[in-house]
């Protein structure tokens, strides 16, 4: 009895005692997959390799449309128009079958004839372009991987910029920000629909092909160039007469003298200090090739310089020159003498340290010997009086000289 009562009361539970629900364990957070930028770069490289035939085909089409070879582009345009107008339906099916079978045959032959390279050969040829499976087998060093990632990011940024510009242009057309462009766009769409409805497909293709080849800017550029060349061939005598026509003679023969004499500017500061600063700053501002400088110096030397004594006599005898004009003529003669000194270094190098002159390594001429030095080798300052100047200002005015001249003048 008791056993049966226990068995009967076993499944019954008091209302106050409720069974505890099994506690559900909180789900563990799933680990997010790690992002590997280098794997992204490898995938991009593989995609480039897969799309390489399409890229080459696009480059070829752009080459023809830009009329880089005018004869080839003209023959292609005429040939396509003839094919579009003459081929019937059966011929088009044959062309489609040929376009499918030729790439398939080329791919099969390439796979059959391709040599299998071992790992060592792949590592040796790593600096060349790698193919599909080679990208997964060749290990790149860290600098190479960083360079690949940088190149990928640069290309991605350029692609996104072009895409944003294209989307902005499309939104401007759709939102009628420029009514002229939007009207042209929608008018072209309506005209295309009407043309597709009214004309046969062969004529539509012919018009589209002619528009692509003959309606771009490059075609008009080529036409203008050929027109100019034909005009030159047809009228060569007129151009020769135009080039050989002499300039109008000067009235009284005074034009040449007026052009050769420099204009006097009385407002310039012609004090000895300013003249010396101009002479010191002049060699630093000249950044010419040494070869050109050598030719100029040789030409100037061949012309011959006047005798200093004759210059002094001419200046003393001429009573019409003012004091400023005399000073200007003296400064110009001194500058010409400095420029006519033949440099010892014909290749644009410093005489002291053989450094090549550039924008950063400026040329400086020694005021005593006239050779070309850099600013470091020609950095010694000596008073003008040490070089024989007797003016009162020569005691306090200094000039730049090289190291050897500094030792000679300091003794």
From Swiss-Prot:
Instruction: Mention one GO molecular function.
Output: zinc ion binding
Q: Where is this region: Sufficient for localization to endoplasmic reticulum tubular network and for interactions with REEP1, REEP5, ATL1, ATL2, ATL3 and SPAST?
A: 1-205
Provide this UniProt record's keywords sorted from A to Z. Cell membrane, Cell projection, Endoplasmic reticulum, Endosome, Membrane, Metal-binding, Phosphoprotein, Transmembrane, Transmembrane helix, Zinc, Zinc-finger
Q: Where is this region: Disordered?
A: 1-27, 234-286
Q: Which SMART domains does the UniProt entry name for this protein? A: FYVE
Residues crossing the lipid bilayer are: 67-87, 89-109
Region labeled Sufficient for homooligomerization — which residues? 1-92
Q: How does it sit in the membrane?
A: Multi-pass membrane protein
Per the UniProt entry, the signal peptide is none
One GO term under biological process is: neurotrophin TRK receptor signaling pathway
Query: According to the UniProt topology, which residue ranges lie Cytoplasmic?
Result: 1-66, 110-187, 209-411
Q: Which residues lie on this side of the membrane: Lumenal?
A: 88
Pfam annotation, one family: FYVE
Q: Which GO terms describe its cellular component?
A: axon; dendrite; endoplasmic reticulum; endoplasmic reticulum membrane; endoplasmic reticulum tubular network; growth cone membrane; membrane; recycling endosome membrane
Using the UniProt record, give the first listed, main subcellular location.
Answer: membrane
Q: Where is this region: Necessary for interaction with KIF5A?
A: 271-361
* Chain positions covered by the region annotation Necessary for interaction with VAPA: 286-292
- Residues binding Zn(2+) 1, per UniProt: 350, 353, 374, 377
Assembly and interaction partners? Can form homooligomers (monomers, dimers and tetramers). Interacts with RAB11A (GDP-bound form); regulates RAB11A. Interacts with FKBP8; may negatively regulate ZFYVE27 phosphorylation. Interacts with VAPA (via MSP domain); may regulate ZFYVE27 retention in the endoplasmic reticulum and its function in cell projections formation. Interacts with VAPB (via MSP domain). Interacts with RAB11B (GDP-bound form), REEP1, REEP5, ATL1, ATL2, ATL3, SPAST, SURF4, KIF5A, KIF5B, KIF5C and RTN3.
Q: What is this protein called?
A: Protrudin
Species this protein is from: Pongo abelii (Sumatran orangutan)
């Amino acid at each position: 009895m008791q056993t049966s009562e226990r068995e009967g009361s076993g499944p019954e539970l008091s209302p106050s005692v409720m069974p505890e629900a099994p506690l559900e364990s909180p789900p563990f957070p799933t680990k997010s997959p790690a992002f590997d930028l280098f794997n992204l770069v490898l995938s991009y490289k593989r995609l480039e390799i897969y799309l390489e035939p399409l890229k080459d085909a696009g480059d070829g089409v752009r080459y023809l449309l830009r009329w880089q070879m005018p004869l080839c582009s003209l023959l292609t345009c005429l040939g396509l128009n003839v094919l579009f107008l003459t081929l019937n339906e059966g011929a088009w099916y044959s062309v489609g079958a040929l376009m499918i079978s030729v790439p398939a045959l080329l791919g099969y032959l390439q796979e059959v004839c391709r040599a299998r390279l071992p790992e060592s050969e792949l590592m040796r040829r790593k600096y060349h372009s790698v193919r599909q499976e080679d990208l997964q087998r060749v290990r790149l060093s860290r600098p190479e991987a960083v360079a690949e990632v940088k190149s990928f990011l640069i290309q991605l940024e350029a692609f996104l910029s072009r895409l944003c510009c294209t989307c902005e242009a499309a939104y401007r057309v759709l939102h009628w920000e420029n009514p002229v462009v939007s009207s042209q766009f929608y008018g072209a769409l309506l005209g295309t629909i009407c043309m597709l409805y009214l004309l046969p497909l062969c004529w539509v293709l012919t018009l589209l092909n002619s528009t692509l080849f003959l309606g771009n800017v490059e075609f008009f550029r080529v036409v203008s160039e050929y027109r100019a060349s034909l005009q030159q061939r047809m009228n060569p005598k007129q151009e020769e007469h135009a080039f050989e026509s002499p300039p109008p003679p000067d009235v009284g023969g005074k034009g040449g003298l007026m052009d050769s004499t420099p204009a006097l500017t009385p407002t310039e500061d012609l004090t000895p200090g300013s003249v010396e600063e101009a002479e010191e700053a002049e060699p630093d501002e000249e950044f010419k090739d040494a070869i050109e400088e050598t030719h100029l110096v040789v030409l100037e030397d061949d012309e011959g310089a006047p005798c200093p004594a004759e210059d002094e006599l001419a200046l003393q005898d001429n009573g019409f020159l003012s004091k400023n004009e005399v000073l200007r003529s003296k400064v110009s003669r001194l500058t010409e003498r400095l420029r006519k000194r033949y440099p010892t270094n014909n290749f644009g190098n410093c005489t002291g340290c053989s450094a090549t002159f550039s924008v950063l390594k400026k040329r400086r001429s020694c005021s005593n010997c006239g050779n070309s030095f850099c600013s470091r080798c020609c950095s010694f300052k000596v008073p003008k009086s040490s070089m024989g100047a007797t003016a009162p200002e020569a005691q306090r005015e200094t000039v730049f000289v090289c190291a050897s001249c500094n030792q000679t003048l300091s003794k």
